[in-house]
């Protein structure tokens, strides 16, 4: 087995030979084998082959076929979650339509909606949109065909779906989220739903994302610390350049009287001290020598 995905009362497994097997509840055809008889043992979805990825939702599922050439869906469809332009359920896979020439890199399935990620960084979603989970603001009636949530070239590398929300990982390590936010699952610092992608607060070096029922998760790799350089004897301009090179910024610049006028315009002290390990982007304050009130001797 190369991948397992669990829905509500049923499960899917993808084998290395590209076949998909399903077991559990089958009241609306979510096992994909043409019947609505639940099964306590895995049954093969014979209509599928060359499958490279799977995702199970509440009562429906999606599969990526032929390395991303197409995406297929089956099961319940009362909110259009199969993406075939109808709201009729299907006990065998049907092709998701109207995604143009997008080559598919990943798929996700939520409560009554599903989404795909294109290799071009675009995100497409369909199904229920009661809390903005399709991300194409404003929230609206269900979409029975894919709508474009995020345009190509966005840098999105992974998507994940919760009950009524989604998260997306960008190549630079930031994370976007949209949809329901009743329990703060969007990570924005509020509980207000959002109908279009917004950046999750505080995540800048994430490497993986996942979404649960009412929560979101990210693997976050902390940045290595920045080391404060020695700035004594530098001019303010030189200090700023040295800090920038170290991944830091210039903070407060104070002036003290240099009564002998031999360090005018030069850094006399700094905070934090040289060699201190700090968070990248931190500010370093400096003190610069200035002339006496009555001028230099």
List PLM regions with ranges:
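Blade-level signature of beta-propeller repeat domains, shared across WD40, Kelch, NHL, RCC1
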Residues: 207-223
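Ligand-recognition elements built from short beta-strands and adjacent flexible loops
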Residues: 223-297
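Conserved core positions of repeat-based scaffolds
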Residues: 10-13, 22, 60-63, 73, ...
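Conserved GH/AH loop at the N-terminal boundary of individual WD40 repeats
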Residues: 7, 48, 57, 99, ...
């Amino acid at each position: 087995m190369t991948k397992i995905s669990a829905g509500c009362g049923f499960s899917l497994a993808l084998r290395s030979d590209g076949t998909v097997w399903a077991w559990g509840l089958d009241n609306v055809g979510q096992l994909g084998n043409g019947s609505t008889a639940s099964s306590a043992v895995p049954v093969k979805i014979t209509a599928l082959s060359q499958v490279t990825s799977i995702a199970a939702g509440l009562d429906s599922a999606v599969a990526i076929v032929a390395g991303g050439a197409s995406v297929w869906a089956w099961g319940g469809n009362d909110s259009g979650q199969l993406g075939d332009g109808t709201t009729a359920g299907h006990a065998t896979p049907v092709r998701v339509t109207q995604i143009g020439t997008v080559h598919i890199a990943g798929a996700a399935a939520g409560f009554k909606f599903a989404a795909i990620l294109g290799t071009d960084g675009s995100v497409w979603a369909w199904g229920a949109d009661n809390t903005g989970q399709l991300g194409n603001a404003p929230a609206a009636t269900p979409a029975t065909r894919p709508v474009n949530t995020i345009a190509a070239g966005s840098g999105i590398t992974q998507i994940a779906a919760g009950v009524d929300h989604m998260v997306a990982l960008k190549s630079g390590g930031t994370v976007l989220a949209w949809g329901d936010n009743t329990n703060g699952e969007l990570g924005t610092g509020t509980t207000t739903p959002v109908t279009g992608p917004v950046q999750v607060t505080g995540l800048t070096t994430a490497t993986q994302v996942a979404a649960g029922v009412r929560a979101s998760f990210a693997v976050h790799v902390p940045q290595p610390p920045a080391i404060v350089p020695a700035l004594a004897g530098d001019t303010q301009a030189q200090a700023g350049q040295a800090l920038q090179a170290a991944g830091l910024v210039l903070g407060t610049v104070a002036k003290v009287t240099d009564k002998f006028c031999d360090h005018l315009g030069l850094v006399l002290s700094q905070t934090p001290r040289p060699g201190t390990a700090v968070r990248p982007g931190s500010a370093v304050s400096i003190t610069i020598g200035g002339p006496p009130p009555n001028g230099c001797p």
